[in-house]
Amino acid sequence: MGRGADVVALLEPGAARSNLDGLDVECRDVDVTVAKHLEGVFDGARFCFHLAAKFGFWPKDPAHFYAVNVNGSRNVIGAAVEAGVERIVYTSTVATLGLWKTKAGQPSNEDDIADLSHLFGNYKQTKYVAEHEVLRLAAQGAPVVLVLPTMPHGPFDHRPTPSGKVVLDYLNGRIPGFVETAMNVAHVDDLAKGHLLALEKGSQGRSYICGGENVSMAQLLSILSEVTGLPPAKRRFPSTFPMIAGRLSQFIEGDLLHREPRIPLEAAQMASTTMTFDDSRARDELGYRSRPAAMALYESARWFADHGYVNAERVAQLHWNPPKESPPS
């Protein structure tokens, strides 16, 4: 919009649209799982950004993940190609990548393709299948570029996302300790710019990791302590702790009480996995740049606190210490 483009947002019927409030965006309700509903939707459009996916750790209807993430992706790209759209930017995820190198202390990149049988949970599995379907369509001529974001942090995290929930749990004093893992922290604004760079400079059928700074869990919690003034979580749990807690939560809350576990197994598996990534391809080929993790985490924490997500007792303890402004590098 800042470049003068007319923007149309295709939304799942009934989906929240608070992030679009006040923006000059035309919103249309479309069920992407039904190809017929997309007929004519892209007429007159030059570009398409496929940004959304079905996500969750405790799906009530696992088949709906496949319908949205796989069939929906196929339907959207098919309709866009049929309408003559010049370029499609498809948002995949680094969750489709193999992580064997991270065990040796090396970050994964776009060439580290996972084996589907090694991916845990409906989201990862359906995004993997969807990504390979998109690559197949690109090989057949669809003008698609793929962006693989890492862990997004920053403002406007209404739901919140799993990465945002880590920040929120810290703010509310719900992280008594941590497992020594690592992850890639990216500012959501940098990820948005990465999508625009993929539109402008990306090669058809090529995937680009857009990320930020690789940090350990201990570093992440230390940064949050520095920028908020809250005490750091210092207790270190063994690497097996998340999965043990997840299995107990699954059995008691999921199997016995038939409600969403507070610690879903998929979330537990992610919490015990090192997920570091190398975004050199996007930097070299697209000119992608990112800001430090401290800025992303500070803006995430500040937004949650300013919008009523943090309990009053903890808000009273906050003493903000913003990191020094620095341009993305």
Positions of predicted regions on the chain:
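Mid/C-terminal beta-alpha module of Rossmann-like enzyme folds, strongest
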Residues: 194-262, 279, 295-329
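Conserved Rossmann-fold NAD(P)-dependent oxidoreductase catalytic core, especially the SDR/UDP-sugar
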Residues: 8, 63, 67-122, 145
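Substrate-positioning beta->alpha
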Residues: 75, 129, 162, 179-199, ...
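Glycine-rich "substrate-gating" loop/helix at the edge of Rossmann-like oxidoreductase active sites
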Residues: 119-122, 150-159, 176-189
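Conserved glycine-rich Rossmann-like NAD(P)H-binding loop of the short-chain dehydrogenase/reductase
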Residues: 4-15
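Conserved beta-loop-beta element that borders a ligand/cofactor-binding pocket
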Residues: 92, 131-155
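NAD(P)H-binding glycine-rich loop region in Rossmannoid oxidoreductase-like domains
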Residues: 14-21, 25-71, 79
